[in-house]
Amino acid sequence: GYHILISATDANESYLTLAKQRNLDGIIVIGMYPDEFYQQMKKTQIPIVLIDSYCNDHYYNNIRIDDAYGSYLAARYLLDCGHRDAAFFAGQLKENGVMKKRLAGYRQALEEFGVPYRESFVFEGQIDYKSGVAMAASLARSSLGATAVVAAADILAIGAVRGFYDAGLRVPEDMSIIGFDDLEISQYLAPGLTTIRQQISLKGQRAVELLLEHIADPSLSKQEEILPLKL
């Protein structure tokens, strides 16, 4: 069997010290961190698998999706439906982060349809329900004239439905929304939420499998797996 330690690291905590003190055989890291983090973690000399990271250091194994392509599919869906004024709701747009990649996909779709990119149509916040509500309220109060929203996460889309409802706008009659992630909770919305589906559980499964393979044989070459997604 295996012992699993789940830890949220403090901003001031030494990741290298943490790994050594706990005598870890391998590590799975979720999300993006500063470059210093990746340089520090290499010093552990133990197998590490990254999930949802765009770190280009070949020391690491990496499991992710093509976030830009997924967001491109979402934006293109709305454009194919005739929308030319689609806003973009996102979490923090960190350089080389997932949200930045999803913004790039949105921009690519606009460009292909000859629709100008407008920064005023991009709303940035946290990836949570309250941010979705707040973004929708802000868009509803604005004079932008948006008719649709590409939400870079389902939880933002779910919050947005509430925010638009509170502002007197109906979804999808007055405002169309498409999400990203295909969270189970999105199935319970009425009407249902159109979303980009990624297999989140498969990310975890493949990360563990890859980590165990490299613990058993550290000489294995590093791998990057880009998992499928679909509308």
Predicted regions: what they are:
Residues H3, P47, R84, P116, ...:
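Residue-level detector of anion-binding/catalytic polar loops
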Residues I6-Y15, I63-L73, F89-M135, V150-I158, ...:
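Hinge/beta->alpha junction and helix N-cap segments in small-molecule ligand-binding domains
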Residues F37-M41, Y106, A160, F164:
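Hydrophobic packing residues within well-ordered alpha-helices of enzyme cores
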